[in-house]
């Protein structure tokens, strides 16, 4: 639990930007961040919809880390979660587009544009 709390206090720029959009959006889907699940701490999760969202920085680009991520995804899938992965760069530079992709994986979810999006225009 301490590690998850620490991660919530120090999000990456991409996690911070995406969290702002997910919190501001009126979708009816409630996300938690840095949540312990299955022995891992996931970046974001919508528990009722069984959806995990991971924001991967450059350290995820090497073969060893990719294999660890694959294993992690298999464990989470085995627990009934769908896992979506996005690059840190994409989450930081275009969090609204990333959020749109996330919402497309939430069947029956009606998305209403947020104040955050209108402020970006």
Label the predicted regions.
Residues 1-29, 78, 107-121:
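Solvent-exposed, charged helical/coil patches
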């Amino acid at each position: 639990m301490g590690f998850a709390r620490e991660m919530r206090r120090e999000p990456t720029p991409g996690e911070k930007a995406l969290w702002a959009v997910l919190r501001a959006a009126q979708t009816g889907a409630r996300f938690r961040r840095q949540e312990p699940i299955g022995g891992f701490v996931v970046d974001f999760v919508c528990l009722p919809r069984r959806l995990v969202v991971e924001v991967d920085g450059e350290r995820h680009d090497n073969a060893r880390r990719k294999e660890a991520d694959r294993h992690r995804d298999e464990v989470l899938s085995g627990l009934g979660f769908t896992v979506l992965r996005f690059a840190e760069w994409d989450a930081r530079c275009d969090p609204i587009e990333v959020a749109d992709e996330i919402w497309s994986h939430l069947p029956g979810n009606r998305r209403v544009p947020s104040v955050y999006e209108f402020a970006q225009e």
